[in-house]
Amino acid sequence: MRMTVVKHVMLTLICGTLSWGVQINTLAYASAIKSEDGFDMDEDGVYGDDIQDYINAAYTHERPFIQDKSKHKMETYTQSLLHTDLETDSQISRERGNYINAQELGDGNNEHVDLVNRTMTKNVLMKHGHRNFMDASILYKSVHGITHLHAHQRPTEVSVAENQQLLLKVHIPQENEHTYTERWSFLPAAPCKLTPPSIQQVCIKHGACIHDVVVDVDCIAESMEHTLVEIGYVVHASKAVHPTWTVVNITEDFANYGFDTPDVKPGVLKFEHMNAHHAGVYIWNLQGTHGENMYVTFLVKLNNSIENHIDLPAVTPKPKGAEFHTWHYHSHVFSVGETFSLPMHLQYKIHDTPFDLLLEWLYVPINPTCQPMRLYSACVYHETVPSCLSPENPECTFASPHIARRVANTVYQNCEHVNYTADCLAVSHVEPGSGLEIQNGGSALLFVNAAESMSGLYVFIIHFNGHVETVAYTVVSTIENFVNAIEEHGFPPEIHNVPSPSSPNVTANNDVISETNTFPFKTYAGITGGFAVLALVCLALALVCTKRKFGHRSYWSDKAAYGQSTYYAGVPVDDFEDDTEVEVDEGAECGGSGYTVYIDKRTR
């Protein structure tokens, strides 16, 4: 059982995992042939015996012989298998074993492998239902190159009242004459009094989440996983024998926990009297001599009001916002006078409608002496951080978008369709004289008769409802001026010795004012001070009036970009410092963020 510590709050026990311990990326050379006439069908209509014979025989023959024959004989077997029903467990087990063993002989023909696996899956599911679903899945998953089959299931939560019986039970495999070893491990909850273990949704990445047992990182050192009991047994071939298994060994380790000896048999762990010491995480692991490897996890809680406990179905929260992913090249070399396209291939899922979308292209020239150029993507999300506005070595740095050139952008406002490029109105703008054109709804740039001066670092930014969602970049240059570019995820070093605009340089005056000249000076200072106070009061009143009219955010306007319409882009602010109430004029919309795209509808 592998554990991973999650930052600050959790340790994830990756559980409910089924791994058969065999690599079946390709099930090759199962078509090792007996004769040019193909395989001999047995009485059940299955060619398994012939295949197994020649899989075994292949170890004593030259591999090229097997490879040459398999290419044109595999089809005979697979086409026949399409019309063959696997009626019994023994046939299914035998066929699966044949193909698992076959993988050791080579890479095989993937097209035929696909056909065999889909046929096996169909037969198993139709004839044997849920119990053999994993048998079928193993064959199907192999087609897609999955080395191990991991079946993530939600851990089971068990609440038991004090002094009541605690029974944990798992369905065990019934493969005839197979030997299995089971291990029950225990992670006590007692050391985690403030934050006991719980079942939570754990996300490996956006949209890829599983339910797992989460243990607070602060109590991991005190609450370690220990083996409680280990049991080995053999499954009998005849179901007439009861029980259908024989225990061959059992080891126990309960002394450290003060447990009474439980009732243990294959797939079962039972305590007669539940108490606080029994609460925690129980992990059942089964390993077999044929590569089986299964995990099941239980979260056991002490509940003094078990009669009032109601298991509610898990509620998966509805995804919000949007997801954008880009595929692109990080460099493009061109010749002067060439016309070419610079695309950003987008894959996206939009969960909230209506929405505002801004696709913009920014540009900074490249300096051939910079090796490399550096893009600080954190500055795209935090445009006004001082080190982003005044980065060290600015000629070789892309930091805040405020100090870059916006060469093109496309705006989709109040769009109610997920397919925004086809169903929503777009407003695009390209910097005049740039030699650029917008393509693919704003996600690509067309360079027309590209000049040397168009070489630069082009940064593509997607804003969804005013928030930056994706940042991508490409260096476009001639071969003579090519430089590499790398993305840094922190903030750039700030340039040193930059005079602050709010602190002008003042030269000290060492002249001494005589006592006789102090009266005119005081009079002048009093008059000047009075005017200054009056000016400050007027300025404060003007700011209050302006704030009430336009809200607490400032906006810049570029009427030339859209003709009669006015395009507004939010000036970023610190949301933690500015918590005043937003007032928006009637007829306009604001997304409520320092990075919000804001378009006045009345001017459209």
From Swiss-Prot:
Topology of this chain in the membrane: Single-pass type I membrane protein; Single-pass membrane protein
UniProt motif (Internalization motif) ranges: 568-571
Compartments (UniProt record): Virion membrane; Host cell membrane; Host cell junction; Host Golgi apparatus membrane
Main location, first listed in the record: virion
InterPro entries from the UniProt entry: Herpes_gE_N (IPR046463), Herpes_glycopE_Fc (IPR003404), Ig-like_dom_sf (IPR036179), Ig-like_fold (IPR013783)
Glycosylation sites: N117, N249, N303, N419, N505
Keyword RNA-binding in record: no
Family membership: Belongs to the alphaherpesvirinae glycoprotein E family.
Record's comment on post-translational modification: Phosphorylated within the acidic cluster. Phosphorylation determines whether endocytosed viral gE traffics to the trans-Golgi network or recycles to the cell membrane.
Keyword hit for Transferase: no
Gene3D superfamilies given in the database record: Immunoglobulins (2.60.40.10)
Positions of the UniProt region annotated as Interaction with gI: 192-219
Disulfide bonds, paired cysteine numbers: C370-C396, C379-C388, C415-C424
Protein name per the record: Envelope glycoprotein E
Intravirion topological domain residue ranges: 545-604
Role description: In epithelial cells, the heterodimer gE/gI is required for the cell-to-cell spread of the virus, by sorting nascent virions to cell junctions. Once the virus reaches the cell junctions, virus particles can spread to adjacent cells extremely rapidly through interactions with cellular receptors that accumulate at these junctions. Implicated in basolateral spread in polarized cells. In neuronal cells, gE/gI is essential for the anterograde spread of the infection throughout the host nervous system.
Transmembrane segments: 527-544
